[in-house]
Amino acid sequence: MARYRNKVSCPAQCDPKLQSTGDTSWDSYATTMKTAFTPKRGMVPDLIRPKSTRRLGFTYSIGDPILNESQYHDEYTWKLRSKENMVKTGTSRGVWNHKTHPGQEFFQWTHPKGKQTQKLPWIEPPSEESIQNAVASQFISCTKRDFVDLTQSKKTMKRFPRSQDRKSLLPRPLDTEFRYNYQIPAQIPELKDFSFKYGCYASLPVASQGLVPSVLSSYIRNEERTKKQTTYECDYGKACLDFLTILDSFTPSQVHDYLQSVSYKDRQILERFIHSHCDIEAKPNKREKQSHRKRP
């Protein structure tokens, strides 16, 4: 094993790039970013502002005295006209050439000989009438300028043929718009006949005329329901009172006391009714007893 260990060479000895440079502060975990882009060391020179360009600033430096000039004053103030470079007839070699051909702007145009020059119309002095009209036109009102006189407008209207307005030919009612739209509706005479009393005409006080249908059972039932005073009587009430149920609700002593307090005639009538009621109850009891006797 020791032999093989001696034969194995170190990668730093084979690759010259990986050989140690004597720097003891070597970081084994350094990234490519750190090795390729090393931090700058040393003094960084001051940035010099160029004076030839206007975009990066003014031509003066910070230490110079501040005059009454700014970028706005430098760009937007009135400046003197720059002197144009005169055309030099000499060449680059310094030889003067007298046969120059200047441009057309150097020529001075004149009229041909024998032709009389006419005065321009705006150079002639104005007459008194034109001056008076110009002064008078300044005092014309807006209404007179915008709205023409009626007499003048009528003359202009008579020249053109007038088109007939069709709306004016339509017949118009004499009533107002409200009366025309909200007038009494036309009544049909056939609908005024109230000889029948059905539907909405059932409550009219006018007597019905003509044929009347036969009375139905539903009409009778409705009339009977209208006679009742309350809904309870209509649903749960009976046509006659059941006196037998009333008598059964009292005890014999109460009935006897009541008969003593009533007059003699009323007492006889009530006693007859009570005896008849007792006979009605006694007859079914006797029949039940006889049936029980026959069975055994």
Curated annotation (Swiss-Prot):
Segments for region (Mn 4): 175-189
Region (Mn 2): 69-83
InterPro entries documented for this protein: MEDAG/TEX26
Region (Mn 3): 140-153
Coiled-coil segments: none
Chain spans, region Mn 1: 30-42
Positions of the UniProt region annotated as Mn 5: 229-243
Name of the protein this chain belongs to: Testis-expressed protein 26
